[in-house]
C-alpha cells in the first residue's frame, strides 16, 4: 500500500487513452503528471506518475483503473518522476511536485499523506492535525433544524455587538429544549465550546485562540460545580493562563459569552446585573 505510483499504459486508439485518463479524479490527487511516448517498435504508451491523497493497494488500482496499465510504487522525488514522464510530450499535469526538504508543505498536508508516520514521529502534532480534520468534517456536515422561540430570542441577542460585561444565561430545567444542539451549531461559526471544568484547563484551551466568542454547555451533572470564576475571567478579557505555557492575556476585542444550563444562575456567586437570562 502506498500513495505514490508510476504507471505505463500501452494503447491503440485516442479513445482508449482518454478513457483511461478520465478515471483520475482531481479530488483524490496531490500531484499527477502524464506524458505520451512512442517506443522504437512504434507502440504508443502513456508514462505517468501520481501521488494520491490516500494510500491505495495495487489491487485497488487495478479495480479502479483496469488491468491493462502496469503500476509500480514510485521511487525518487516528484520532480524526478516528472522529468521522466515528460521526455517526449506532456499531456496533463495537476498540482505542484513536492521538493524534498521543501518548507512549502503545510503540516496538515504532511499529516494527510501519512498519519501513522506523523503519529510515530510527533504524536502531539498528529493529535492536533486529527482534531482539526475532525472539526472540519463536523462543521461541513452538521445540519441545524428549525429554530425554537428561545433560540430566535438568543439569535437576536447575538446579532447585537457584545459588551464588556453581559453574560447570556440560557436556562431550561427539563432538558431536551435544544440547548446543546444550539451550542454545537456555534462551533461552525468559530466559537469556543466547552463543558466547563477546572479554571486553568478552560483558560489554557481558550488561550489557543483568545478572540473567539464563548459557549459554556454545562451538563446537568456539573450544575453544582458551575465555574463562575472562569466565566467572569474570560468575559473580562484579562487573565493569566498558567498551564503548560504560561501567558498573560489582555484582549481588546469584546466577545459574546453564553452559558447553556439546566439550572438558573446562583445570585450569590455572580452579579445579577451581568446576567441576560433567556428561558427555554
From Swiss-Prot:
Which Pfam family is one of those matched by this entry? RNA_helicase
Q: Which residues bind a divalent metal cation?
A: 37, 45
Tell me which UniProt keywords the record has, alphabetically. Answer: ATP-binding, Covalent protein-DNA linkage, DNA replication, DNA-binding, Endonuclease, Helicase, Host nucleus, Hydrolase, Metal-binding, Multifunctional enzyme, Nuclease, Nucleotide-binding, Nucleotidyltransferase, Transferase
Q: Which InterPro entries match?
A: CRESS_DNA_REP, Helicase_SF3_ssDNA/RNA_vir
Catalytic site positions: 84 (for dna cleavage activity)
What's a GO cellular component annotated to this UniProt protein?
Answer: host cell nucleus
What does the Swiss-Prot or TrEMBL cofactor note state?
Answer: Divalent metal cations, possibly Mg(2+) or Mn(2+).
**Documented EC number(s):** 2.7.7.-, 3.1.21.-, 3.6.1.-
Q: What is known of its domains?
A: There are 3 rolling circle replication (RCR) motifs. RCR-2 is probably involved in metal coordination. RCR-3 is required for phosphodiester bond cleavage for initiation of RCR.
Subunit (UniProt): Homooligomer (Potential). Rep binds to repeated DNA motifs (iterons).
- This protein is called Para-Rep C2
Q: Say which species the protein is native to.
A: Subterranean clover stunt C2 alphasatellite
- Lineage of the native species? Viruses, Viruses incertae sedis, Alphasatellitidae, Nanoalphasatellitinae
Q: Which gene carries the instructions for this protein? A: C2
Amino acid at each position: 500500500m502506498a500513495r505514490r505510483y508510476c504507471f505505463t499504459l500501452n494503447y491503440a486508439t485516442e479513445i482508449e487513452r482518454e478513457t483511461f485518463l478520465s478515471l483520475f479524479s482531481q479530488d483524490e490527487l496531490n500531484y499527477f503528471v502524464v506524458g505520451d511516448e512512442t517506443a522504437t517498435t512504434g507502440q504508443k504508451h502513456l508514462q505517468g506518475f501520481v501521488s494520491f491523497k490516500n494510500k491505495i493497494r495495487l489491487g485497488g488500482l487495478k479495480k479502479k483503473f483496469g488491468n491493462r496499465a502496469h503500476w509500480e510504487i514510485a521511487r525518487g522525488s516528484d520532480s524526478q518522476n516528472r522529468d521522466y514522464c515528460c521526455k517526449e510530450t506532456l499531456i496533463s499535469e495537476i498540482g505542484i511536485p513536492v521538493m524534498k526538504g521543501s518548507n512549502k508543505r503545510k503540516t496538515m498536508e504532511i499529516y494527510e499523506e501519512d498519519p501513522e508516520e506523523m503519529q510515530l514521529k510527533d504524536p502531539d502534532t498528529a493529535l492536533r492535525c486529527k482534531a482539526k480534520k475532525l472539526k472540519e468534517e463536523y462543521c461541513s456536515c452538521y445540519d441545524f433544524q428549525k429554530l425554537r422561540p428561545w433560540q430566535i430570542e438568543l439569535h437576536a441577542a447575538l446579532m447585537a455587538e457584545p459588551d464588556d460585561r453581559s453574560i447570556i444565561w440560557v436556562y431550561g430545567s427539563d432538558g431536551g429544549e435544544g440547548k446543546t444542539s444550539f451550542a454545537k451549531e456555534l462551533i461552525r461559526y468559530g466559537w469556543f465550546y466547552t463543558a466547563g471544568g477546572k479554571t486553568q484547563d478552560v483558560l489554557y484551551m481558550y488561550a489557543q485562540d483568545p478572540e473567539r466568542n464563548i459557549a459554556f454547555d454545562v451538563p446537568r451533572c456539573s450544575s453544582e460545580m458551575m465555574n463562575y470564576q472562569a466565566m467572569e475571567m474570560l468575559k473580562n478579557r484579562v487573565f493569566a493562563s498558567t498551564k503548560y505555557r504560561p501567558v498573560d492575556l489582555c484582549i481588546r476585542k469584546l466577545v459574546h459569552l453564553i452559558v447553556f444550563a439546566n439550572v438558573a444562575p446562583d445570585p450569590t456567586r455572580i452579579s445579577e446585573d451581568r446576567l441576560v437570562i433567556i428561558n427555554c
